[in-house]
Amino acid sequence: MVTSAAIDCDIHPGVPDIKGLLPYMSEFWQDSFTHRGIDGFDLMSYPLNAPITCRPDWRAKGKRPGASLDALRTEALDAFGIGTAICNPLTGGQVAVSETMGAAICSAVNDWVREHWLDQEPRLRASIVVPAQAPLLAAEEIERCAADRRFVQVLMPVACEMMLGRSYYWPIWEAAARHKLPVGLHAGSMYRYAPTSTGWPSHYLHDYVAQSQAFEDQLLSLISNGVFNKFPDLMFVMIESGVTWLPGFLWRAIKTWRGVRGEVPWVSRSPAEIIRDNVRLTVQPFDAPADATIVEKIVNQIDDDRMLLFASDYPHWQFSSEEDPLPPGLSPALAQRIRVDNPLATYPRLQETV
């Protein structure tokens, strides 16, 4: 059943510390984490006390941002008229150096989300959190969770140990494609390498702004290494990438491809055509002034109404309006596409469950 209510493609449940995940782990990992005294495993992409991590009026004293399901219902689902929302848990399991430890944490997070969020709120769906540092284990986790149709996407950080077009990652793409699950690439890094091409940032400001570079690099890696040739129906969703980098990237990718396409003969279509067919972006953060004229110009440069997906990014503090996560200047028809039609077309399982 299709609903006119909005579909939020990016909300973040507050994942508990390791102690809260132990019940979802094997006896071996319970003993290992306990005896080694490992409890916190938080990502540095969103430090818990950073202002951007949680809007001030959504921050509950003594609780992790996004930890309360009741608050999510009131502050996001009801406030924004959301009929369905996709949970994208951010967990240190996705960046652990130990592949098996990372896989254990990711599996525990998926089972925790299933029990504490999906089973408790019928409007919620979730992404399968996978250990991208271990593609074979990631593929196994996709197989384990895919039978639950409430899992609608595969989730991993955009900056991993190497470029995502490399065949090393293809077991993940193959498993996702087989189950018709989009792959969500979320802003964030394993920090195996500097997040910029010229070295390590000195401040969070620099690290955060540099994230758009990773999205550009990985997108071109996927194209030039033939991922979309091998998996022509696989969809990638750029989550929290910002949007305004895309028009300039499209122009430069097309221009350069025309000049050196002999190097990559398997890329038989324009990068822009591939991106418009196989890539989507969430609208928060939009990374543009709250100026309707500027927003309209950017949307016109993207030149495809299918590409943008509604997202509040709850509880992160990304947009200035307290009423609507959508940027200003969108026509009613385009706003409807972004809120409902595009998410339904991007996530096949939502067509079954919305």
Can you annotate each of these PLM segments?
Residues 1-354:
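Helix-coil boundary/capping segments in enzymes
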